């Protein structure tokens, strides 16, 4: 079980390889990363039998940027018939698992396996339960089967509290019919990823205020309004009338990079298409100057050296706050709804503590 298998957005396999190789080196896990461009997956093959397990135990999945999902395990070939017997035979070396997910990679070929996986899961789950290899226990590892085809599957394990919260790392979010653009799902997914669900009522509630920089037509503003917040939308373009009719939105025709709120707000969100260094500087300024407590900002990626650029910007942000003497939580992820970009979340810790006395 010396291979770490990872899902990702097609075209970002190289970034996954660079990122996981760096963490493996930090944890003294020897091996090599490999991937095929456009395959929507990557592997890190460890030279030691326990390498993949040590790598997963030493690294929090939520802190990885480009991998959508991961599991440690092995590839096995399957026959056309009686696949279950072959899987059960290989599972003799596996521990009893607490849950089962069948996955496929995010490519056209992978999507064609969706119906097969749905039907096959019913029979496989029954067989695993009867064999005593599957129980309902989240404290036990999750069994992840990623089908590359009907004849090849990666059998892997991952801890449910240190892996993706959705199969393949793809959220099942419904587009709100009254939202003005599909970009609204990007911010909703960011909240799921960066904020524990049991903290939403505390950190995303109707007594809060927010600013949306580059807001038009209002996809991200809609999410803030949907939580009951009073929102200042900054954009020279028009906002959706449905949002303005809520009475919760003030639209200011202004430049998102020069606007400063008269009073500090709880949230700043920004999805402006601009050079990533400029958006990163905006993020540092708003949190550092105390204009907001939490922020979600998208960083558009260059064509080359994308992981290196993201890492450089995150290090610059972190060093900037250290120089200011400000403690912050910094998160960064290429979300499913992101394209050539990553989403950053920052939370100023001192400010968050002070607000509890309100």
From Swiss-Prot:
The active site is at 300 (proton acceptor). It is found in: Cytoplasm. One of its GO terms (molecular function) is S-adenosylmethionine-dependent methyltransferase activity. GO terms for cellular component: cytoplasm. Coiled coil: none annotated. It catalyses: cytidine(2498) in 23S rRNA + S-adenosyl-L-methionine = 2'-O-methylcytidine(2498) in 23S rRNA + S-adenosyl-L-homocysteine + H(+). One of its GO terms (biological process) is methylation. SUPFAM superfamilies: S-adenosyl-L-methionine-dependent methyltransferases. Keywords: Cytoplasm, Methyltransferase, rRNA processing, S-adenosyl-L-methionine, Transferase. S-adenosyl-L-methionine binds at residues 183, 216-219, 235, 255, 271. Its EC number is 2.1.1.186. Catalyzes the 2'-O-methylation at nucleotide C2498 in 23S rRNA. Monomer. Belongs to the class I-like SAM-binding methyltransferase superfamily. RNA methyltransferase RlmE family. RlmM subfamily. PANTHER family: RIBOSOMAL RNA LARGE SUBUNIT METHYLTRANSFERASE M, RIBOSOMAL RNA METHYLTRANSFERASE FTSJ DOMAIN-CONTAINING PROTEIN. This is Ribosomal RNA large subunit methyltransferase M. It comes from Pseudomonas fluorescens (strain SBW25).
């Amino acid at each position: 079980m010396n291979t770490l298998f990872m899902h990702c957005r097609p075209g970002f396999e190289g970034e996954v390889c660079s990122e996981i190789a760096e963490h493996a080196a930090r944890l003294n896990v020897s091996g090599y990363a490999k991937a095929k461009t456009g395959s929507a997956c990557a592997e890190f093959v460890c030279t030691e039998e326990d390498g993949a397990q040590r790598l997963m135990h030493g690294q929090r999945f939520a802190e990885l940027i480009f991998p959508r999902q991961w599991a440690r395990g092995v590839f096995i070939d399957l026959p056309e018939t009686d696949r279950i017997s072959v899987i059960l035979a290989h599972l003799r070396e596996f521990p009893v698992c607490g849950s089962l997910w069948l996955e496929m990679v995010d490519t056209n070929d992978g999507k064609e396996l969706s119906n097969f996986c749905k039907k096959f899961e019913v029979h496989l789950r029954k067989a695993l339960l009867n064999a005593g290899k599957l129980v309902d226990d989240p404290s036990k590892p999750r069994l992840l089967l990623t089908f590359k085809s009907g004849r090849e599957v990666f059998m892997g394990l991952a801890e449910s509290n240190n892996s993706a919260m959705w199969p393949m790392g793809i959220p099942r979010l419904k587009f709100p019919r009254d939202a003005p653009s599909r970009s609204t799902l990007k911010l909703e997914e960011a909240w799921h990823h960066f904020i524990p669900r049991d903290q939403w009522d505390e950190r995303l509630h109707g007594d809060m205020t927010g600013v949306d920089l580059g807001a038009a037509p209002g996809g991200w503003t809609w999410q803030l309004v949907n939580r009951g917040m009073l929102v200042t939308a900054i954009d020279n373009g028009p906002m959706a009338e449905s949002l303005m009719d809520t009475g919760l939105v003030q639209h200011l025709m202004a430049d998102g990079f020069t606007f400063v709120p008269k009073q500090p707000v709880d949230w700043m969100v920004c999805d402006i298409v601009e050079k990533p260094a400029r958006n990163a500087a905006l993020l540092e300024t708003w949190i550092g100057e105390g204009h907001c407590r939490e922020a979600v900002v998208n960083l558009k990626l260059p064509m080359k050296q994308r992981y290196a650029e993201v890492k450089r910007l995150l290090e610059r942000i972190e060093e900037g706050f250290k120089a200011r003497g400000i403690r912050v939580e910094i998160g960064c992820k290429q979300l499913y709804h992101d394209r050539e970009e990553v989403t950053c979340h920052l939370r100023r810790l001192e400010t968050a503590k002070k607000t509890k006395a309100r």
